[in-house]
Structure formats: structure tokens, C-alpha cells
Amino acid sequence: MRRRDFLIGAARGIGSGVVLGSLGQVAWADTGQDQCFVPWNSKTPMASWHKKKPPYRIALSNSYIGNEWRTEMVQIAKMYSEHKAVKPFIKDLKISSAGNDVNSQIAQVNQMILSGVDAIVMDAASPTGLNSTIDKAARAGVLVTSFDNVVTTKKAITINEDQYEMGKRWAEFVVKHTGGKGHVLMVRGVAGTFVDNKRYKGGKDIFDKHSGIKTTEVYGKWDNGTAQKVTADALASGGGFDAVWCEGGDSGVVRAFQQAGAKVPPIGGEAENGFRKLAAKEDFPILSIGQSPALSALSIKVAIQMLQGHKVPRSISVPLHPVTNKTLKEGKNYFPGVPDSFYAAINIPECGLNFDAQAVVNQKV
């Protein structure tokens, strides 16, 4: 199998319909591909791949399994691949995690190439560190789709939500609620990753326009326990904060304020279930925008679409779904019956990807 050149053209779906099952509503195929496969911008070219008959051998290369989001992402990938409407297209799904080490992930991907997989879906440890390995995969006839922490090589299809825009919107929310003045705690993610870099730049570009805003930065690693600790440390060191800008671990941030006996300030943050539950109960101002762990399922869907011979944008923009205090709805965007650490942004409705929260929790990794 050889890699074709990237071509300009129109994307088509694999099929049509919504499949109902134990996952809740899971649409395997076309729900209006103009809504799902949205080019990143007007200059994004279309991409194609050599058509191959299913079923396909697919591997998920995950750089890091150290927080709730990554676990949930893997759970959703497994659920999607095992669904009765998807299963005929997948011969095998192998999942490996690399401990957030670039060299380990390179070795992992090299092994996947040698094993003869048809496609690799990847959450990368570095935007650039795996580029040469992905180029090697392309030469070997292995399709690579990159999601969440995406890579920069043009040999991969990238699938992501706009991280810069997410960080920017959180900051705009903070500015609105502070009047552009005050002390803001910035709880960052995992240092050096694409997502952290882009979100941080989006936030700082807004904060730097307001001389009345002072920021303190900590790294919460998108993990509730870590975020709670670093927030508690910041509060203990004498930090009085007028607002929080948070990339993840928001429930931990709220708990840190509560345990310190401090008023929970406005928080622009991610989509942990506990964060939204607490906001619904206690009504502190929030803007919650979640990176969907269903990006893994969408990346598998894109890989199968391309292996079927269809074209997709080389860089796909997944819509953001902001939630405010006014739009919080039990059972829709937060779930009382599942853990606080659960990431509630599990659906990408534009792509027909709608999962049942309890089924995700119950899925074995």
C-alpha cells in the first residue's frame, strides 16, 4: 500500500444512519460530513489514502495515561471499536501508552509499523519529536491520524479542537468577571505539550492586554489531585485570587478553595463532571469548555474513512461546546451518577458520536 498525494476535493461519508446500543446513541457513519469533517481553515487541503478492503488493523499510540482524561479517551476508543456497527471494519485495535516519554513513544510506533498495522491513531508526547517516525510510517504505507496533542508533520491527519481559542475564551471570561483587574491563578496542563502551549498562549494573549491583571502559574497536569495540591500551595503561600484560568483538574481547584475556607472565584476551565456538578450546586461563575475524549473515536472514524478511499481535510477542526451556569443541564452535560473526575464532554454530536456516561465509566481499559 502506498501513500497518495494530498488532493483538493470534497469529503464524503462512509455510510449513513444512527446505531442504537449499549453505548447510548453512536452514529458510525454519515451525520452530515460537512458538519463533522470541517477544514481547519480555508487553506486546508483535502487528503486521500490508498483504498484497502476492510477489516483493518489499527493501533492507538497514547503518550500518557496519568490522568482521568487519558483513561477515558482509551475507554471511548475501545467502546467505539467494539460497537456492532464499527466492528466489521476493525480486525484488531492495539492500545499502548508511553509514559509521556518521546523516545518510548517512538519505539512504540516503530513496533506498530513493524507489526503491519494499517493505521495508527496518536496522542503525541511532542508536537515535533515524532515527526520523523510518522514520516517513516507513511513511507511504509501506514496511515497516521493525530489528535489532542497533535504533531506538525504534514504526513499525518490532525484532528483537534482549537486549543488557542479555548484558552482565549477562558481568559475573556475571566476578564469579564474581574473587570480586567486582579490576581488570576493559571493552572496549566502538562509542560511542553501542544495543548498546553496553545491554550496558554490563547490565555496570555488576552491577559497581556490588561495591565491590571497579575497572573500566577502552576502546573496541574490536567489531573484533579495534582491541580488541588498546586492550588492549595498557591493559596497557602499568600495568594488571594480573584479568578482562575484552568486547563484541567478544575474539581481539584474548587476543592482547594473550599478546604482553605476561601470563596470560590469565577473559573474558566475544562469539563470535569465534578466541576460542573459543584457549579450547578453552589452557583459560582464558570465557563466550562471541554476537550472531548471522544476525539479518539473520531480519529478511528477518520482512519477508516480514509482507508475506504474517501477524502478528508488534512487538518480537521472539531467544534467547541461551551457550557455556562445558564446552560448546565443534569444528564446532558453533567452526570450525578458518575465520578467527579469524569470528563463530561463525551459527545461530538456533529459527527454522530454520542456516548452514555455510565457505559464509559464501566468500560475496562
Residue ranges and their predicted role:
Residues 6-8, 15-19, 28-365:
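A residue-level marker of the well-folded mature domains of exported/periplasmic proteins
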